């Protein structure tokens, strides 16, 4: 399974939290444009670490969890993988990430 940040989404990691937003809101819109815009979300420090593993290019969940296991020491690999997949899938469902 692969994940990536959508092309029209911006993610920033700050000290203590993360910020993800849909940049398409900042462009000109036609009057008949009925698309749903995602808005913005703040995530915790651990969520920001997870999202910072992604970019605009697809990345394997196993590669991501491999790196995360070096940061979240003491967490079982399968537990970390399950938590990461659940976390990423929330953002897929909300439209911030792509999955394939």
Predicted regions and their residues:
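Acidic, low-complexity/disordered tracts enriched in E/D and polar residues
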Residues: 1-53, 93, 100
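Long, charge-rich, low-complexity alpha-helical segments
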Residues: 36-100
């Amino acid at each position: 399974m692969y994940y990536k940040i959508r092309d029209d989404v911006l993610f920033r990691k700050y000290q203590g939290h993360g910020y993800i937003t849909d940049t398409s809101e900042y462009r000109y819109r036609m009057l008949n444009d009925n698309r749903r815009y995602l808005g913005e979300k703040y995530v915790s420090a651990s969520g920001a670490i997870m999202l910072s593993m992604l970019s605009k290019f697809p990345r394997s969940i196993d590669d991501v969890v491999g790196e995360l296991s070096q940061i979240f020491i003491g967490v079982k690999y399968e537990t970390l993988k399950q938590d990461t997949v659940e976390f990423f899938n929330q953002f897929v469902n909300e439209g911030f990430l792509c999955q394939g």
